[in-house]
């Protein structure tokens, strides 16, 4: 078959090699123009055609990520068009117990909580997120490599005798997970130059061989794509007014209600949805009640996600995340307002990006920030930190970076 593959940044090169191994005539296109030249030469040495724009001609199959607009095809005749997720579904061979998590917000947090809860219950866990990939240990996530969370990288997960592999996925999934989760669809944003919606890509995560878990309020929407859904939500409720730097008391419904005091080193109320999802996953796997409760008590948050620090005599909130947007910023500010913590606050927004695809909407972010009455400074992304006035008692840093 003549196979055309678009996008060499999000794993198209991996799929190209799989098709080549099957004897296909493969053309791979660097549509974003940022694939390293060394990688292109490596593929050419394997007799894979590499181009910077789509060559004209007729193809039997075209493989492209859902976020690529069809206009990239130009005058080519694509034949059957399949997404990266659908192609991964065809090729993936990993038989280890796998949990895949996609969604708009909270993916990394949910994956960290799931990994910790499973590890604390005695399981060996590999964690693959936008922060990196590696085993979960008694000290937390041991990151051994930085790697994309695009669907094709599910085919290159680290080897090892793990009881569970927990994977964050950007858009879609393999369709073959043992447990597939969608955190939420708080914004069904446009992709592929607004020719598709994010939900059209994320729905590819639904598995035909395991359990599918979605937010309870979103069951009516997702049921058009998957009939056998497990709803999550409502297992964790705040029982005391949150205060900055103090762990809130929460009531956890997991085989009966229990009161738990969360750690105060991170904004725990930002994590309530992720906690709900992690508890639902663990309940479906039969993780003991006391084990998950202790995991919640000892969880310290994801590094760089709602961290509460003390620097230069002031408190600092640090959000380092590829998913920084007006929605995530609004959520952080709302949590801080609930703590009466915004007096004397200032925001630094750093748009530095390390292989991050989602662009920030400056106007939307400014409107959200203005609604909370907090001054904001936007950096040039050059690593130069702006001067912080001495009367600022709380510095909130939003840094958009990570691996997608």
Question: What spans do the regions from the language model cover?
Answer:
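ATP-dependent carboxylate-amine ligase
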Residues: 1-35, 284-287, 294-302, 308-404
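Short, basic phosphate-binding NTP loop
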Residues: 1-100, 121
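Adenine nucleotide phosphate-binding catalytic loops in nucleotide-utilizing enzymes
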Residues: 6, 196, 230-329
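Active-site regions of enzymes building and remodeling cell-envelope glycoconjugates
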Residues: 24-25, 38-52, 59-62, 75-83, ...
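Short, charged/polar "capping" segments at the starts of alpha-helices
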Residues: 33-40, 68-74, 135, 219-225, ...
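Conserved substrate/cofactor phosphate-moiety recognition/catalytic segment
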Residues: 34, 125-155
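Walker A (P-loop) phosphate-binding motif
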Residues: 86-132
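Flexible active-site lid/hinge loop adjacent to a nucleotide/diphosphate
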Residues: 147-223
